[in-house]
Amino acid sequence: DHLFFRGRYDYRELLREISGRLSTLLSLPQIKEMLIGSIAGALQVEKVILVIMEKGRFRLYGEGLGRQGEEPPGEIGLLIRILEREKRPITVAAAAKRLAGREDRERLAGLFKQLGVMLVIPLPAREGVAGMIALGQKRSGELFVDEDLELLSTIANQAATAIENAQSYEALEALNRDL
């Protein structure tokens, strides 16, 4: 695969490919599928979950989930609030440090465990967070490095814009159908 270089991905090439594909997609299902597949393949992670705000509610998408589009556990609100404050990728350990109460830390750790993820990257919105990309451990067992986090943050920013555009386009199509 041309996105890998000696067992690792080519950061610039992957970013160029994902950016190009995101700029041409107007279908939310296609965007979700492309993001999940590209990130899972390039970073060789065990799991990729997208959490996206749709019609006022967060929804889960990814491989290995029971149903696509189901609502996440209630503890997701804790994590969203942390991401709104931090505005950057955050691990389960770092997220727990942001919480004062032991009960909240345990609930958050339980959420990460239930989802099978160890890193979350916010999808920024005009106001707050429109969702997140949640990643499981790398298959190699390696930790995420700064280059990974920079890449994921850039992808998340572009993905948030593409998702917002697709949602606006779908709303416009629905309005035109109803006329």
Which role fits each region the language model picked out?
Residues 7, 11, 25, 161, ...:
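Amphipathic coiled-coil signal-transmission "stalk" helices
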Residues 11, 24-61:
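Helix-loop-beta substructure at the N-terminus of cytosolic sensory domains
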Residues 48-88:
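GAF sensory/regulatory domain recognition
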Residues 63-68, 108, 132-142, 148:
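Short beta-strand-to-loop transition segments that serve as allosteric relay/switch motifs
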Residues 79, 116-124, 133:
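A short, aliphatic-rich beta-strand micro-motif
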Residues 95-117:
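Signal-transducing coupling segments at domain and membrane junctions
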Residues 111, 123-129, 138-139:
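Flexible loop/coil segments at beta-strand boundaries within sensory signal-transduction domains
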Residues 149, 153-160:
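Allosteric cytosolic regulatory segments
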